């Protein structure tokens, strides 16, 4: 996939380790319904915690529209596990340590900022791998889950 994935683009399948060290594929998630793939810069930082906890707190709403939430950052498997355990996340956190998936979707910042090289972006991906929506917001952490739900509710009402 070219840099800067947009609404309507098809997301290529990928495989990354989750917080338990289990290899997970995008296609595996999509087999069970649409996916909300949210990129966050760094586990255990204030903004990323607010965003990730909001996704956790809306579990019932995402279940109502048959969608799965999947977090992703450049953090190690061990740090993702610590982050998940600390906040009781009920969804997988994927480790993209070299930023390969972030690069494919255009989520890498142009300036090298070490662990903060990943932008805060969310992709709502339909079961056919087409992107339904791309959500950009570095400062409004709750917008990611809230807007993803609006898109998924509109999809469900079609």
Task: Outline where the language-model segments fall.
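Chalcogenol-based redox active-site neighborhoods
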Residues: 1-158
């Amino acid at each position: 996939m070219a840099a800067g994935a947009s609404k309507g683009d098809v997301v290529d399948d990928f495989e990354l380790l989750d917080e338990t060290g289990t290899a997970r594929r995008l296609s595996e998630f999509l087999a069970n319904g649409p996916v909300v793939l949210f990129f966050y810069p760094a586990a255990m930082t204030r903004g990323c915690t607010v965003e990730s906890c909001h996704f956790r707190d809306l579990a019932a709403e995402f279940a109502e529209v048959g969608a799965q939430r999947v977090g992703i950052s450049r953090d190690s498997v061990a740090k993702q596990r610590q982050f998940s355990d600390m906040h009781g996340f009920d969804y997988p956190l994927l480790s993209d340590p070299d930023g390969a998936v972030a690069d494919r979707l255009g989520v890498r910042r142009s300036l090298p900022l070490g662990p903060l090289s990943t932008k805060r972006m969310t992709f709502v991906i339909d079961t056919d791998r087409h992107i339904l929506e791309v959500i950009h917001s570095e400062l409004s952490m709750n917008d990611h889950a809230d807007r993803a739900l609006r898109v998924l509710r509109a999809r469900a009402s079609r």
